[in-house]
Amino acid sequence: MENNSHNVDERRAARMRGAERYKIQNVEFSLDQNLLANLESSTSSSTRSSPASNQQNLEIVSQSEAYHKISDLDDSTSIFSISDQENILERRISEEVVRENSVSSIENVSSSAVARETQSSANILVKDNHFFSHKQKKIQRESIPFHKRDNIETSDAYSSSILENSPPNKVQRLSSLDSSQDSFQEEHPGNVTGTTFSSQAPEERIASPISTSSPESLTNQSSSLQSSLQTSSMAPRNLLDQSTEKDIVVGASDELVRIELTKLSKEAGGSKTLNELDAVQQFFQEFIKENEPLEPYVVKVKNAFVEQVSIRLLELIDLLDANRILSTACKKAANEKLAVQRDLSKLREDRLSVQRKKIQLRNEYIKLSHQQNFLDDIDDFFSQCETVKNELENVTTTPNSTEAFSEINEYASALSKNYGLESQLVELQSLLTQFYQKFLS
C-alpha cells in the first residue's frame, strides 16, 4: 500500500508539471474603465429599437471599441506585430468611413451603388477570413461575370462622391486608404479584381444611429438591404452557409464532440494501458491553444479555465488511482479471506478427528480399567492362596482346616462365576482338594 500511494504522488506531481506546458500565453492586461459605461449606453439605446437594429448597433459599438483598443495597445501587451496592427487599423478606418458616409448619403446614392458598396464591404470581410480565399476565384469564374475596367471606374466614381461629402479628417483617412490600395495594386496587379470586388454580400448591414435616422432613410436602408440580399443570393449556397456558420457562436451543450482514441504499438512507444482522461485533457488543451483569441483578457480567462480543468482532471485521476489501489487491496483481502476460511475448515476437520480419537481412547481406557481390575483380583486371589499355603504349613492340628478349605472353595467359586475362569479355578480347586486330602492322611 505504501508503494502504491508513493507512485500516485509521483504521477500527480508529474502531471502538475506537465499541465504548465499547455498554457497559451502569459498575458498581463487591464480592463478599460469606460467599457461598462459604453456597454450600458449601447444596451440602453438598443432597447428603443427593433431586434435587428439592436444587433446592428451593438456591432457598431463593438467595432468602435475594438478600433480604440487596437490603437491603444502597445508592443508589450499586443499579440500582433506592428505591420499587422497597421493593416488592422487601415481596414477598421476604411470600414468606419464607408459606414458613416453611407449613412449620410443613403438618400442620394442609388440602389446599384449601395449594392456595389455591400460587395466591397463583403470583400473586406472575405479578405479577413482566409478560409474563403481559395473558393472566391472559382465563384468569379463560374457564377458572376464582370468587366474589370468598368468596375474600377465605378468604384473610383463612388469614392470621389464619398470624398466630396466627407469632412476634412475623414478625407485625409480616405486618401491614405486610397494610396495604400494603389500601392497594393502596383505590387499585386493580378489580384486587383479579387481585392476590390466580391461575389458575396454580407447578410447583415450596420444601421445608422437611432437619433440621426429618419423614416425615409430607414425605408431606403431596407430597400438597400433587400437589393443586397438579392445580389448575395447569386453566390453558392455552401459559401453562404460557411460564412454564417463562422459567425454563429455555438454553446457547449449545443453539439456533441466525438473523440476517438488510438493505442500506439510497442514499436512506437505505446503501452498496454491507455488513460482516457489524459487524452481528453490533452485534446482540449491543444484545441484551446490552436484557437488563440484576439483579446488578452479572453486568453487570461482561457488560461484560468484550462488550469482549473487540469486540476480537476488530476484530482479525478488521483481518485481513480486510489480507487484502483483500493479495489486491488479488496481483491487481495478477499483472496486472503478465502485462504483463511480454507484453513479454518481444515482445523475443524482436525478437531473432529481429534474428538473421534478421544472417544476411542476413552473406550480403550474403559477396557484397560476392566482388565486392570481383573488382574488386581487375580493378585488378591494368589495372595490369598499364599496365605492359605503358609497357614497349612504351620498348622499342626486340624481343627480349622475344614473352615480354611471352605473359605478357599467359596472364594474360588465366586471368582470363577464373576470373571469366567471357571475351568482354571475348577482345576485349582481339584488340586487343592487333593493336596488337602494328602495332608489329612
Swiss-Prot record:
Pfam families: CENPU (PF20994). Residues 160-173, 192-201 have a biased composition (Polar residues). GO terms for biological process: cell division; CENP-A containing chromatin assembly; mitotic sister chromatid segregation. Its main location: nucleus. Keywords: Cell cycle, Cell division, Centromere, Chromosome, Kinetochore, Mitosis, Nucleus. It is found in: Nucleus; Chromosome, Centromere; Chromosome, Centromere, Kinetochore. Residues 174-183, 217-233 have a biased composition (Low complexity). Residues 160-240 are annotated as: Disordered. GO terms for cellular component: kinetochore; Mis6-Sim4 complex; nucleus. Component of the kinetochore, a multiprotein complex that assembles on centromeric DNA and attaches chromosomes to spindle microtubules, mediating chromosome segregation and sister chromatid segregation during meiosis and mitosis. Component of the inner kinetochore COMA complex, which connects centromere-associated proteins and the outer kinetochore. COMA interacts with other inner kinetochore proteins to form the inner kinetochore constitutive centromere-associated network (CCAN), which serves as a structural platform for outer kinetochore assembly. Belongs to the CENP-U/AME1 family. Component of the heterotetrameric kinetochore subcomplex COMA, which consists of fta2, fta7, mal2 and mis17. The COMA subcomplex is part of a larger constitutive centromere-associated network (CCAN) (also known as central kinetochore Sim4 complex in fission yeast), which is composed of at least cnl2, cnp3, cnp20, fta1, fta2, fta3, fta4, fta6, fta7, mal2, mhf1, mhf2, mis6, mis15, mis17, sim4 and wip1. Interacts with mis6 and mis15. This is Inner kinetochore subunit mis17. It comes from Schizosaccharomyces pombe (strain 972 / ATCC 24843). The gene is mis17.
